[in-house]
Amino acid sequence: MSTAVTEGIEVTVRSTFRPERSEPGRFLFSYSVRVVNQGEAPAQLVSRHWIIVDANGEREEVVGDGVVGQQPHLEPGEHFEYTSFCVLKTPHGSMRGTYRMVRDDGQAFDATIAPFPLVVPGSLN
């Protein structure tokens, strides 16, 4: 699990290995994200930038609009949750990134998504 707070936007992520959707050389992980507006001003999540690194150091970047087809607008105290997936070629790696947030007054900033592990249980023993 990882948590980061940037300008009042808290991002918490938990990852889970999905053995039923994995096979040798293709390890599928789900990750659940909770974004909370702890600040005093509304903000909208408009885009994402993920950096995914596997155990071989192979890096993939994913950039796109919103998350799961949405661009949630969060009033102070509101939250948004979603679950998505990631596939690695190795049994462990990590993800990190940012969400581009825009305040109602047009001010934009990047909310940090702290690094979190993607690990097949027992693979690091």
Swiss-Prot record:
Q: Its encoding gene is what? A: apaG
Q: At the top level of its lineage, which domain of life is listed?
A: Bacteria
- According to the entry, every stretch annotated as the ApaG domain falls at 3-125
InterPro entries, sorted: ApaG-like (IPR050718), ApaG_domain (IPR007474), ApaG_sf (IPR036767), Uncharacterised_ApaG (IPR023065)
Q: Could you identify this protein by its name?
A: Protein ApaG
Among SUPFAM superfamilies, the record links this protein to: ApaG-like (SSF110069)
